[in-house]
């Protein structure tokens, strides 16, 4: 009887869908391209399967502005949650990835919603509330140290490398 129980337990491990569910949270930067019309940017990618219910997750979020770059230099402008295309994500720097719980995933999704501007609101600030501040908040929610020094607020890759150094438990290397 004991052998049968062990055999069935081993068999369950091999069946499809019996793998441990997990969602990963990855932090990305884009170097920017004046020819391509994109400025430096930082965003997150959530990927995997939730433990509760087995829902598949494949999402990404960044914080940007719908106003032009010159407007953003002058002060507060409308902010938007920006979702990137797969082709764009493939061209970015993946700085580090960590596994998060279902509860952390739910909290991060709530934070994404909280960053959405209501119609008529202007909360995006190039120096005080930009893509770096957005993912810094999410990094903190995931248990990372992620302060934003003023000299890094417009330099996503530099800032994510800084966060990499502050969090050696990630086992990540700086992106060159």
For each feature predicted by the language model, list its residue ranges:
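A structural motif
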Residues: 99-112
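Glycine-rich catalytic cores of cysteine/serine-nucleophile enzymes that process amide/ester linkages
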Residues: 22-94
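Bacterial N-terminal signal peptides
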Residues: 5-15
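Sec/Tat signal peptide C-region and signal peptidase I cleavage site
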Residues: 15-22
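Second-shell loop/turn segments in exported
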Residues: 29-34, 92-101, 117-126
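Extracytoplasmic/secreted proteins, especially bacterial periplasmic and envelope-associated proteins
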Residues: 38-41, 45, 107, 130-137
């Amino acid at each position: 009887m004991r052998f049968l129980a062990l055999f069935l337990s081993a068999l369950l491990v091999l069946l499809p869908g019996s793998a441990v569910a997990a969602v990963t949270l990855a932090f990305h930067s884009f170097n920017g391209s004046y020819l391509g019309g994109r400025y430096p940017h930082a965003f997150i990618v959530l990927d995997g399967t939730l433990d509760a219910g087995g829902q598949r997750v494949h999402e990404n979020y960044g914080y940007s502005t719908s106003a032009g770059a010159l407007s953003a230099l002058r002060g507060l402008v409308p902010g938007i949650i920006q979702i990137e295309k797969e082709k764009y994500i493939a061209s970015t720097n993946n700085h580090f990835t960590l596994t998060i719980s279902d509860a952390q995933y739910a909290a991060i999704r709530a934070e994404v919603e909280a960053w959405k501007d209501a119609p008529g609101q202007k909360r995006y600030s190039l120096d005080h509330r930009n893509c770096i501040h957005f993912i810094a908040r999410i990094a903190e929610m995931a248990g990372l140290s992620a302060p934003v020094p003023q000299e890094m607020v417009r330099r996503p890759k530099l800032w994510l490398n800084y966060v990499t150094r502050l969090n050696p438990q990630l086992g990540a290397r700086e992106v060159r």
